[in-house]
Amino acid sequence: PLTIAEGDGYQVNYRKHYRKALLNVIPFNNFSGSYSASAGLIYQRDKEENQQTPMTMDTRTAFVVDDNTIFFYAGVTEEELENRELYKVTAHFEDDGILTLDAPHKDKIGFNFISGGYVISEEMDALQPYLKHRYIKLDMEYEYNELITDDLYIPYRFKGSLTMERKINTTIPDEDQAIIW
């Protein structure tokens, strides 16, 4: 664990002229990371599925909440969107493959969780025997509204899966160092 504490003991490296240390600490759990989202289809709910081309996203980043929970942004919501907090969806993982979704602002965006599950599979690399591939597949279906104004919105339904591959070097004992990011 890393602890950052203020103190007078820090000495500036005057040769390099650095006065601050910039750290990019990224917490992780077994489910956080970058997921392939191209198998997740986003439909407008007010049109028939066979009368429209579904929208997709290339990737979706899942961020840590706690050991068994992540959050991501609903549907086609951009991760740089100014009001992205409205579209935050939390995913909680149970031990038996059950995935439950919730949204902190579900009343505002009309979030409705329909179904969810997940599968974790592992296999060793054929060419590099020390390398383990862990695949996490999230299957889910939910509905939400994209707000245009206070009384105008577009109703969407997400249906499909997100998949993440994590490569783990089994010769390294520290979990955070063993993952090949």
Regions found by a protein language model. Give the residues of each.
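Intrinsically disordered, low-complexity regulatory regions in eukaryotic proteins
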Residues: T3-W181
